[in-house]
Amino acid sequence: MLAELGACLLLAMVLLDSDPGTQAMEGVKCGGVLSAPSGNFSSPNFPSLYPYNTECSWLIVVAEGSSVLLTFHAFDLEYHDTCGFDFLEIYNGASGDKGNLLGRFCGQVPPPPFTSSWHVMSVVFHSDKHVASRGFSAGYQKDVCGGVLTGLSGVLSSPEYPNNYPNNVECHWLIRASGPAAVKLVFVDFQVEGSDECMYDYVAVLGAPGPAHGHHYCGRTRPPTFVSLGHELQVVFKSDFNIGGRGFKAHYFSGECQEVFTAVRGNFSSPQYPGAYPNNIRCHWTIRLPPGYRVKVFILDLGLEEPNSLTRTCDFDHLAAFDGASEEAQLLGKWCGHHLPPPVTSSRNQVLLLLHTDRSTSGRGFSVAYIGVVPMNVSCSRTDFQILISAQALAPLERTKVYLGSRSCAAQEVGSNFRIQARFDTCGTESQRRNNTSVIVSVLYIDFSTAGHDDIHEYEVRCEPRRKEASAHLLSGSDLLGPYAATAEHLQEAPPGDEAEVLEGPGTMVTQDTSDIVFLGLCILAGVLMIIAIVVLMLL
């Protein structure tokens, strides 16, 4: 108990050291550190008028591993449309870091209940030199089982996790996103007493689509990932009178901290960008494209906490990309600081980007753009190009939206593919010399434009006629890609293979025409046979 109290006081001293704490007019006492499991506080003189020129700061610190539930009993502050005069600010952590700000409030409408994503919360009250009102009264409590969760992200777990949970408990959590955004829930650990139909101890999630809604989960198998139909998910945990387990731990993501992108091109940024991102959050962005596509991700701006000065690794705030739909997929890259990394390309049609921030130090965050790499097969002979793209990969585009050089060289639909067969003297092709090699170059256009929005993807198609080798390169010719807009990024070349496999696999192909080799081999064989015939005739 003394150790916990000492830790709380030490944490309070550290957090208060970064903030002036209580700054009120002479003679007014307010603010301070609240470390009891629950309590109440109010503006000076409440319910009478609060004084002018007052600033009070309360730091609420409860036991590590718990959260703080803050509710308001009364609220009456001078109104202003931007709360620029008298106001109350609520922080998810220390008030010295603006990235922790949950909201600024004034007027007579009380703030909603807030639950912190960790065991620290700050409240700041400010009044100017004009107009005073009754002020506010608020209460807080250490929230160990259930509650309303409104942050961008956070953690919920069974009571006393990772120790065994107690018997005869029932917890209800309501995870609420701001506005119309969805809520995502991911279980990272799960051990609950198992039974047929999970009749004894169980976890249930309400607000998800389909049969997952209200389904009971128990045992050791982690429940699936849930995404709400609306802007709320409810989680229920219940245990009976005997037999327990380690319980569960889950991460939730809401609002601008979790999104799924399915368009073939897009961009997104960290919460509050280019303002300071919040501390102590964990955000998921999933890019999910049709099968066969790969995803190329460009970091356009990066302003995160610097790496560890000793190890030079991103141990604190960082952005990470995974080659798949979960954090268990292969890591494509992990970044922090301010140095812009090169683009990364997935090996499949899904990418997960994760932003993790710790409890201190924030920056402006990041801005990201991505583009889907269309799966295609490109080959050439000494005289022409051939391009094959699965029509299913481009659905619902019409063939006229795919063309080489100009719209007059549009693709033809052949079976289940879009096909372009073009001679080198047509379709905008031109001869160039690169690295002392003569190449034929043209541009393939794929038009994803919709009404009022231009979106044309460009690929440079290149052939070395002498070697009959062809390749395709994504041209980043859009303002969406910022500093990469003027560059041509060479996509990873996949090994040549069967045509059917090519259309289902990675997008950029290098193929070689072997017809000349076969022809030369036949000529040599014919020559050898002719010499043998002549020798036989001479011997006769």
UniProtKB/Swiss-Prot annotation:
Cellular component aspect of the GO annotation: membrane
UniProt-listed SMART domains: CUB (SM00042)
First and last residue of the signal peptide: 1-24
Keywords of the record: Disulfide bond, Glycoprotein, Membrane, Repeat, Signal, Transmembrane, Transmembrane helix
Cellular location(s): Membrane
Database matches in Gene3D superfamilies: Spermadhesin, CUB domain, Zona pellucida, ZP-N domain
PANTHER family xref list: CUB DOMAIN-CONTAINING PROTEIN 2 (PTHR24251:SF47), OVOCHYMASE-RELATED (PTHR24251)
Gene name, Swiss-Prot/TrEMBL: Cdcp2
Domain CUB: 30-143, 145-255, 257-373
Protein name stated in the entry: CUB domain-containing protein 2
Extracellular side of membrane: 25-516
Keyword field contains Glycoprotein: yes
